[in-house]
C-alpha cells in the first residue's frame, strides 16, 4: 500500500466512526487554504472531546497543531509529537506563553493551533483570554468550534480577525 491509500483509508474509517457509529454531525469545515489560525474548541468538559476532535481533524484531512513545553520534544517522544502536529514552546528569556506561542506561528508556513480557552475540563463562567492575545500578536484569525453534545454536532464557525477589542470581538 502506498501512503495515499493509507490516508484515504484513515479518512474513511474516521468518517464511518464519527457519522455512523457515533451518530455525530459536522457543520462546516476549516478550509485547507487557511494556513494559519487559532482554533478555539468550546466546551472542553470531558475526556471524549479529544477523541471527537481527532476524528474531525481526520475527516477534514488538514493538520491541526498543538504546543507543549520544549522539554516534551526530546528523544524518544519528540519525533512523534512533531509528526502529529506538535511544536515546542520555548519560554526562555522570560517570555510568557502569548509571546512564545506567537513566535511559533512565525516559524511555520502552516500552523493551525487548537486551544481550549477554558483551560480546564470543569465548567467555567469565563474563558481565559490567552488565545485572543496570541491571535492578536501573531496576526492570525480565530476559528470558533463548538461541541453540541445534546445534538451530537460539531459546529465550525467562520474565521474572524481580532481587532484588539476583546469584548466586541467575542460577540461574534
Write out the residue ranges for each language-model feature.
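Serine/threonine-rich low-complexity intrinsically disordered regions
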Residues: 1-2, 9, 31, 165
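Compositionally biased, charge-rich terminal segments
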Residues: 1-3, 63-64
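Soluble catalytic domains of membrane acyltransferases
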Residues: 20-172
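N-terminal membrane-anchoring alpha-helices
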Residues: 2-25
Amino acid at each position: 500500500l502506498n501512503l495515499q491509500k493509507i490516508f484515504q483509508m484513515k479518512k474513511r474509517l474516521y468518517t464511518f466512526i464519527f457519522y455512523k457509529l457515533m451518530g455525530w454531525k459536522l457543520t462546516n469545515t476549516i478550509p485547507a487554504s487557511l494556513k494559519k489560525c487559532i482554533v478555539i474548541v468550546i466546551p472542553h468538559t470531558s475526556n471524549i472531546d479529544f477523541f471527537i476532535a481527532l476524528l474531525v481533524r481526520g475527516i477534514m484531512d488538514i493538520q491541526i497543531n498543538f504546543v507543549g513545553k520544549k522539554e516534551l520534544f526530546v528523544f524518544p517522544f519528540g519525533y512523534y509529537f512533531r509528526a502529529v502536529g506538535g511544536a515546542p514552546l520555548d519560554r526562555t528569556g522570560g517570555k510568557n506563553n502569548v509571546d512564545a506561542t506567537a513566535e511559533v506561528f512565525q516559524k511555520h508556513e502552516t500552523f493551525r493551533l487548537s486551544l481550549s480557552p477554558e483551560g480546564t475540563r470543569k465548567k467555567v463562567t469565563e474563558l481565559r483570554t490567552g488565545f485572543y492575545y496570541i491571535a492578536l500578536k501573531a496576526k492570525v484569525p480565530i476559528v470558533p468550534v463548538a461541541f453540541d453534545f445534546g445534538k451530537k454536532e460539531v459546529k465550525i464557525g467562520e474565521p474572524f480577525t481580532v481587532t484588539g477589542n476583546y469584548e466586541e470581538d467575542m460577540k461574534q
